[in-house]
Curated annotation (Swiss-Prot):
Its main location: cytoplasm. One of its GO terms (molecular function) is tRNA (guanine(37)-N1)-methyltransferase activity. Belongs to the RNA methyltransferase TrmD family. SUPFAM superfamilies: alpha/beta knot. The keyword Disulfide bond does not apply. It catalyses: guanosine(37) in tRNA + S-adenosyl-L-methionine = N(1)-methylguanosine(37) in tRNA + S-adenosyl-L-homocysteine + H(+). InterPro entries: Alpha/beta_knot_MTases (IPR029028), tRNA_m1G_MeTrfase_C_sf (IPR023148), tRNA_m1G_MeTrfase_TrmD (IPR002649), tRNA_m1G_MTases_N (IPR029026), tRNA_MeTrfase_TRMD/TRM10 (IPR016009). It is an enzyme of class 2 (transferase). This is tRNA (guanine-N(1)-)-methyltransferase. Specifically methylates guanosine-37 in various tRNAs. It is found in: Cytoplasm. It comes from Xanthomonas campestris pv. campestris (strain ATCC 33913 / DSM 3586 / NCPPB 528 / LMG 568 / P 25).
Length: 252
């Protein structure tokens, strides 16, 4: 996959993508990440990329022409078609199903806004989709772009050392439930012991426990996800057992 990022701070994205899963994906040739700076395509001695908004008001608005020229160069760098995605709090919420859709693309172009935003005419003419990573406002779209790069990259074939790792993540699978708790060594600690079932070696019992914990944790923390999940009789039985066994105060 190739991801082009249009940003006034392309080095920010490069730094975020240099580590962990995304860094390994680039080393393995599974991800090509390229940053483009609109300031390189601005005119005049000051290479201005923003100006005051019509109608007055605070802040500055990113100008059409530097963005248009930058996008033109970015799109010409690879022959494959690429949707232009603007990171915006007004966009479609980034979810795991949406991430899976985007992960199937061979290429995408991410646009990071700054200041009060981008001239609406550019968004109308050049942007295919707006995506939001949450109901809050950041100083710019770079953090959102870094999140999207990470989410999409880890879904590429061969990126994770264990493909099952992604399949067992929260929001994955047909039900989209939260993940179950995980434990490692030591089995006994001052802060608690590992559940006995996980040390039993009984794979059937372990699978049942994990499924029940996934259902229960979703019910406790994100109950609205259960409204869209397709649960069979066994799932409903496991969830009911979880509810009955829940100790007072554990609802947190």
């Amino acid at each position: 996959m190739r991801i082009d990022v249009i940003s006034l701070f392309p080095e920010f994205i490069a730094q975020c993508a240099a580590f962990g899963v995304v860094g390994r994906a680039q080393e393995r040739g599974l991800l090509e990440l390229k940053g483009w700076n609109p300031r390189d395509h601005a005119q005049g001695n000051y290479r201005r990329v923003d100006d005051r908004p019509f109608g007055g008001g605070p802040g500055m608005v990113m100008l059409i022409e530097p963005l248009r020229a930058c996008l033109e160069v970015a799109q010409a760098a690879d022959a494959r078609p690429a949707p232009v995605i603007y990171l915006s709090p007004q966009g479609r919420p980034l979810t795991q199903p949406l991430a899976r859709e985007l992960a199937q693309l061979p290429r995408m172009v991410l646009l990071c806004g700054r200041y009060e935003g981008v001239d609406e005419r550019f968004l109308d003419q050049a942007v295919d989709m707006e995506i939001s990573i949450g109901d809050y406002v950041l100083s710019g779209g770079e953090l959102g772009a870094a999140v999207l790069v990470d989410v999409v990259t880890r879904l590429q074939d061969g990126v994770l050392n264990d493909a099952e790792s992604a399949a067992q993540d929260s929001f994955e699978g047909p039900q989209g439930l939260l993940d179950c708790p995980h434990y490692s060594h030591p089995s006994s600690h001052a802060w608690g012991d590992v559940p006995e079932v996980l040390r039993s070696g009984n794979h059937g019992a372990i699978a049942r426990w994990r499924r029940q914990q996934s259902l229960g944790r979703t019910w406790l923390r994100r109950p609205e996800l259960l409204d869209e999940a397709t649960l069979d009789k066994q799932d409903r039985r496991l969830l009911e057992e979880f509810r009955r066994e829940l100790a007072p105060g554990d609802e947190k």
